[in-house]
Amino acid sequence: MRAPAISLSVAALALAAACSSNPSPQSSPNPRQDGRTRGGADTMPGNRVIENSRPDVSARAGVLVVANQEGASATVLDAATMKTIATVPVGVGPHEVAVSHDGRWAVVTNYGDRTTQGNTLSVIDLAAAAPAVTRTIDLGEYHRPHGVAFVGIGDKLAVTSETSQRLVIVDFASGRIDTALATNGRGSHMVASRRDGRRAWTANISDGTVTEYDLDTRRTGRTYPAAPMDEGLAVSPGGVQVWVGSNSAHTVTVLDAAKGTPIDTLTGFGMPYRIGISRSGTLAIVNDPVKNRIWMYEVGSRKQLAEIDLAKVDGVKATTGGAPGEAGAGPEGVTFDPIANVAYVTLHGTNQVVAVDLQQRKVIGFGSVGAGPDGVAFSPYVR
C-alpha cells in the first residue's frame, strides 16, 4: 500500500496563479478537501494528484458520467456499484463527455436535436455532494458541438463544431474561446488527442478524411483520406496509431499517425461506431451497434482478442428501441478505468451502461441510465 502523495508541478503553480487572478469556484482544478483520486490517475503537468490509500487498487472505484442523448441529461454513477448518484439536467441533445485530468469536472457537449442547434457545454462538479451543472460555456457562433477532450496541460478543451467545420479550443477556467481551427473537412464529429494533449485529430464524416492539429502552435496540420463515412476515432496514447471506423464500408482503418497512411484495415463489422484505446495503448475496443457486439483487439498486432455478443449476455435488458439499423442493445460510447482494467460501454438501445473486464473479456456489471445513452467518461474521483 502506497502512502498518499501529492504531485504539483511548476506548470500547475503557474496555472493556479492565473486562476487566482480571476477567482471562480469552477476554475479550481483540485478535488474537494475530503475527496481523492486513485493511484494511476493522469499525472500530466498541471494536475494535482492525490493517490488513494486503498490496498486493492485493482478494485473498481470512481464515477462514470453518461450523456443521455434523448433525455437532455447526464447520469452520474458509482463505478463500483453501478448505482446512480445523480441525474443531472443539461442541454438539448447531449452527445459526448470529457473528464478533467484530476477527475473533478465533467464537460458535456450539448449538440441539439433535429430542430435545435446546440452551442453550449455543461460543466458538472463531480465533487459536490449532489453533482450538478455549475456553469454553462457558451460557444457563440460555433454550433453543433460534439466531440470533446481536455488538452494542453488539462487547462483547455478541444471541441468539434460540425456546422462551422472548426475545432474550437476553449480555456476551461474562464470559458472563453482561445481559438477556432479549420478542420478542412465536412461533418467533423469526433476528436481524439494524444495523451500529452499536444496533438489532436478529428474524423470528418462527410469527406471520409482525418485532420490533425498541432495544439502547441494552434495550427491545423494535414488532412488525409481515411475511409468513407468515418466516425469512430481513437488515438494511441503516444500518438503512433490513429484508428478510424467507417460506417458505410464497415471497416476500421489503422493509420500511421506520422505518415498519415494506412497500415492495416480490419473488416467484418456491421458499424464500427465508436472506438476506444486503453491508456496503456495495448488494447482497443470497437463498439458495433449493428451486429450488437463489442470487439476487442491488440493494438500492436491488430489481432482480434474477443467478440462479446450482447444478445447472449445475461443482464442486458430487452431492447427498448435504439437508432435505425441497431440490433438489440446497441453498444456505443466507451471509456476505460486503467487501474481496475475495466472498460465501460453504453447501450443505446436498452438505456444501460455495462462494465467489461478486460482480462476475463466479459461483461461483469450493469447500470441503468437515462434515455438514449451515448458518450461516457470515467473519473478516478473517489467519493
How should each PLM-predicted stretch be described?
Residues 1-17:
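Sec-dependent bacterial lipoprotein signal peptides
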Residues 19-383:
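Predominantly soluble domains enriched in secretory-pathway, periplasmic, or organellar proteins
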